Amino acid sequence: MIKGKFLVLLTYLWVAVSTGLSLYISLLLIFRPSPLFPSSYWDIRWLWIFAILFGSIVALFFLAADRLLLFFALLSVAFLIIVPLFTIHILLPYLTVALILLIGFGVGDTVIQTVLRGVHLSKIERFAMSVLMGLGIIMILRSLQGAFGLFFLPITLGGLGILFFLFVLTKIKRWINTILLQVEQLGQFFREGNIANVALGLAVFVLLFAPSWMIALAPPIRYDELTYHLSGSQFYVEQGGIIPFPEGGNNPWLHYAEMLYSLGIELGGLATPRLFHLAMTLLSVLFVYLLGNRLFNRRTGIIAGFLFFSIPLVAYEGATAYIDLFVTAFTTAFGFCLLGYSGDLSRRWLILAGFFGGIGLGMKLSAGPILVGFLACFAVLSLFQKTFSKFLFSMGVMGSIILILCLPWWIRDYLWTGDPFFPYGGDLVRKLSTPIIEPARSTQSSFINSDLIRFISYPIDIVLNSRKYYHEAPGGMVATLPFLALPLWLFSSFIPNRTKKFILVGLCGSMIAIGVMMIVNNALLRYALPVFPWIALGAAANVHVVYKYLENKESWLLGNLLFLLLLAFGFSTRLPIIARLSENLPQRLPINYFLGRENREDYLSRNLPVYDAFRFIDQQPGGRHRVLSVGNEFRLYTSSRIDGVWDVKEAHQLLISAQNESELAIELLKRGYEYILINQPEVEFVKWKYDYPILNQSHFLVRYCQLIFAKNGILVYKIFPEPLVLPQPNNLVQNESFEETSGDQLVAWYQDGSIFVSNEAYEGTRSLLLYGPLSDKFGWVKQKLEIESNQLYTFGYWAKALGNNAILLMQLRWLDENENLIESDEIWKNVETEWNWFYWYSQSPQKSKFVEIYLSLGNSEGVLFDQVCLAAGQMCPVKEQP
């Protein structure tokens, strides 16, 4: 073992280099934003805001202004909790989450006391395990309630009342006495003036927590929230129990976590699931601290929790109503139980481990790889410690508990889909059978050249190119945490061998988990979240080595410099969260919604393109409507039945099997479909996914469907059994083919920059040639037209690119009678090197009188325009492609 200065110096430098790299990556996201993600003028502002806040914390701490720092931290906590009560009326979700957590603690405390009788637990260990145990039991009870079709409010309230009476009221006096004792001890602690570290910890926590808190309080708008996590949970509540979605889709993925979500929705509305997931994030952080505290000491435990909570992946994902932090909390608790077992070899720990592992695996299959990896490595460790036979027997009991908790869901999924591990069972069988059916060319070579290299480079990729495994952000989502965890600590004598072995179990188990995930789901970062507690512990171990050495040397300067490096790492993790938020929010975080300057309807209308379309459909007469949806699988925020063609087999089959337009119209109406919803930007962005010739290569949408809604590229058509007779469209655009000029000026058009008239035309003798802003020949044109308010319009033209990578911008600016802007509607589209018809539907707002149509480009390539049209209705009078 190396105890000298060299290892400490190397570790210190490695921490400094990793922190510097994390800062560099995060600053690149701000100063050199990815063209694939929208940037905002607020990005620089947030850079300065976080820099000032972190700097202020450091200044107050070193100036010994402990009470002032504590005052500002407590004031911030009060602000974050109290303001939403008045601005977004969050009281009911608050009370719901608090009640469930309280009951969960009461139930779990009873179980933990019973199972771990005689085992010493600190108060905070007992608290964490009790809350998680109680929530798991509530999920089981909720699953039984749903299985028997008893999701009704009186039954739910009655059941919670019984649990409250049995497990809370009987203990509340003891809890209050404990709290009063803790408050008294805390007061004594403050009177003695030892509050510097408390103030620092609370201030840093608030700074890390505030973005997650604001995101969690905003209305859910992420893909999986809208397609099944919340829409499915809400559906169960509406139907009174667990039944298959009539739409099909991802409904089989709703397991234990969604049972808690359904309970929250029933009692507190759609705001509660995100709060539950955020609570699970905090429990995950708490278990990371508890592991660090048991393995090292309190300081290293705090550092491990800080490192884990600070990474952007945790801070952002934990604020949504996904369930990956549920899995992380339960699998980390599973690891904590194994640590407890390794200390006293009491099988009681493995009973709890079986429960936590069973709930984790029962809620999501992504828990499986980390459980398998951890158990495999722990079994190897027990073999070396000559306790394998005892562990093997106990592992059988633990495995039985895991199986009992998972089996009901697997049976249900098999009955619903034919795959107990939907959808990964079938996928895995296909992947494993591929080498057998393929020619005998070297599969081993293929594995070495691709999968093995990906596996080895995974820690580097997720740091330097995290978008490879997390496509929703430009990068930096795990900071440099994997680099910080480089096992230099393995060679230090400052860390006991038992601690080294257990951290190695966690890290090696994580490696096995990543390897399994690469086979099944490509080890996407969100699915890999359960491995990051162990990476954080490995990183904290390196910091622990440095601190232990500096303590012996009493080096104040180097110790404070290490402290500043940790804060710099925390600062670097705030910026990727800002860059990741690509919703239509200039401020990035939902500040206006949080402060009550924007209501829920406006927030959803601005950030969720289909929201207004959903409201429009729900307002149509006739009760609950059935909608065939192309380019959209979202189901939340509507009472209508949305059949997305991507995940509803019936809808998909109708579109691919129809022989002609008439047959499709009749069959859709026969199946109860009244409307077709098309997300035009999404359909054009992933054409391979929504390639249905009956829709985009025929006149079906014009002959048998009437366009009744168009906004933000979301189109709603009403289906008719017979062909429609539409009014003859009238093109409002003057000089639409650019045949008329007056000197260098186009007649009827306002032009700016370099404008060219070409003799190559789609129809007639002339067309307009424009170049993008990256060219020295950049130019654009517009025309103002008088229109009617609240009227659907078709805006279109023929266009042809002169080179590759050309992008055009279709833009409509709606003006009032005083020519003031009401709103703008726009979309970017790629242009090919042959003539194609480009069109865009939009609805003129109330009080609009004029519209400005723009022809402009991106990049530098030249594009020809011809036959420009703006016409009321869903057609232009020019020749269109089918």
Task: Cite the ranges covered by each PLM segment.
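Signature aromatic-anchored transmembrane alpha helix within multi-pass, membrane-resident enzymes
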Residues: 198-206, 299, 351-355, 371-378, ...
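Membrane-interface helix-loop-helix junctions at transmembrane boundaries of multi-pass membrane enzymes
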Residues: 188-198, 293-300, 344-348, 383-396, ...
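Hydrophobic, aromatic-rich transmembrane alpha-helices
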Residues: 54-63, 206, 283-284, 288-289, ...
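Membrane-proximal, lumen/periplasm-facing interface regions of secretory-pathway glyco-
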Residues: 217-231, 563-616, 632-635
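Transmembrane alpha-helix segments characteristic
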Residues: 16-19, 71-82, 203-207, 302-308, ...
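Short periplasmic/luminal acceptor-recognition loop of GT-C membrane glycosyltransferases, typified by
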Residues: 603-645, 675-681
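Membrane-embedded, hydrophobic transmembrane alpha-helices
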Residues: 1-188, 664
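Extracellular and organelle-lumenal recognition/adhesion modules and their flexible linkers in secreted
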Residues: 722-882
